[in-house]
Each structure stands twice: as C-alpha cells, then as structure tokens.
C-alpha cells in the first residue's frame, strides 16, 4: 500500500475515533487495499464496528459523511466506511458472505482494548 494512503488512513482513523469515542470497537480495512490489488481508482473500504444500535448509529451519520466528503475533496480519495454493530457482526459473520469476506481478507487497523 502506498505510504500516502497509509498516512491518510492513520489520519482518518484518528478522526473516526473522535466521532465515535468509546463506542468504536474495531476498524477493519477490506477490499482491494487489504488484498493488495488496488488501482489508482480504488476506493478505501472500511468496516467500523461499534457498540451502538442502528438508531444510535444514525446520530453519527452526518459527521461520518462530512468526514468522507472532506477526504474526497481535499485528498481525492473515497473513504467508504460501513458501520455495523459489533455483536451483530460477530453473530452473523459465518452466515453472511460479506461479513465472512471482511473477516477473511480484512486487515484490522484498530481494536479497542
């Protein structure tokens, strides 16, 4: 992965932590950047696992969207976060092919202590 992308991911993770605080439990990079088969047009796929209900997650969606827009405009990169409840993800990881794929190919960028 290019150093510039690693640097942006580190910055992005810091901003995500500010948005979600202690509710953020794990951040997983998946997709082309995790597999190493990215191109110059690739977006950055990120799974954010939180301890919030879907209704509670809605309260954070505007801040998350604004952050994504900022990265697109300022750095010409698409950060594509998907936010899921951690327990839901764990419970259904074996049954949902998408979740299985994230677990299989994903690179953990952050894990709460």
Walk through the language-model features, giving the residues of each.
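Catalytic core of pol beta-like nucleotidyltransferases
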Residues: 1-23, 35-40, 51-113
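Short gly/ser-rich loop at a beta-strand->alpha-helix junction or flexible surface loop bordering the NTP-binding
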Residues: 25-33
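Short beta-strand->loop micro-motif that forms the acidic, two-metal-ion catalytic signature
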Residues: 44-49
